[in-house]
Amino acid sequence: MHHQHGEKHHHCVATRRGVVALLAAAAGVHSAMGLRYALAQGAAQGGAQGVAAGPDEWMIDTHHHIYPPRYTRENLKRIVDDSSALPAAAYTSWAPGWAIEQMDKAHVRAAIVSMTSPGIWWNNGDQAREWARECNEFGAAMAKEFPGRFGMFAAIPLPDPEGSMREIAYALDTLKLDGIGLLTSYAGKPLGHSAFASVLDELNRRKAAVFVHPTMSCCGMEIPGISPPAIDFSTDTTRTIASLAFSGTFARCPDIRFIFSHGGGTMPMIVQRVAGQTRNFKPEELARILPNGFTAELKRQYYDIASVALNPGGMAAVLKLVPVSQLFYGSDAPFGTTTAVAGALAAFELPPADIRAIRRDNALRLFPRFAA
């Protein structure tokens, strides 16, 4: 038993070294042969050639996080402070080979990966631009090394409009990534804030898929024994959805395909309470910001079922709010297991076609390149 543990540790170290080589290759300072060799162990053990699954079983995972090594190493204190209640090994030992192993366990054909909280923005635009570029090139190199297994929602320094515009162009036009990943708020500003309008207008022009993941809000409070993300993540998602709706951003940017994490936070449970806030607006204002009504805007957005699928009451609220066509499978790896959400989804009494839609068909409408 001890010997097997040692073998596993050796594999993780070797694969992790491979990721460092991957970053170097992505930056153009390492040979292609070095990149292939570095990730060979992850490919061999992770089954990079494909997933054996029944015709209705394989899935697309749209909520799957990565931890590029230099980013993780140099920002470890920030990551720990943000995620202190989560197992440190999830980010300190993360490697592409491990990710593929987890994907194969749940018949996940492809994962569209993203950065997670705390993200790349710490009130330093130049630093954020550097981290966005490095993380995005890491994801692009990983996708190239494991064809068909990975996509990416690119990181951008959202509070820096000029830097964001440059990184959007590079990520989508040069790296050919699958969309953009945003956090729910930056320095206390939700996504509907006017400071972000120009960047969202550009994403609307590009008809971009935009994955939105929660972060710690500016106004949480500590409860002894309770990890702040357990409550505040869902709340910040709800807050940013409301801000996008009531700022008129949803109406102004109808071509952005927003994907909100964890079934939209607490919004499905309090939707009528939030919808009641329309009484605070004049009719002419509502006609501009919510021409189709509040709930109509929510119904056309997309939501992944990470975490919420493990809560039958929460999942029931999601299914009551939005049609099945708007739901994606998401594992929340490496913090959630790929198999937990898959098992919970299979246990719901939904028609087989609906299960298949959530597993992959809905995602394939937005990301058809993963159909092959």
Regions inferred by a protein language model and the residue ranges of each:
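Active-site gating/metal-coordination segments in enzymes
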Residues: R109, V113-S247
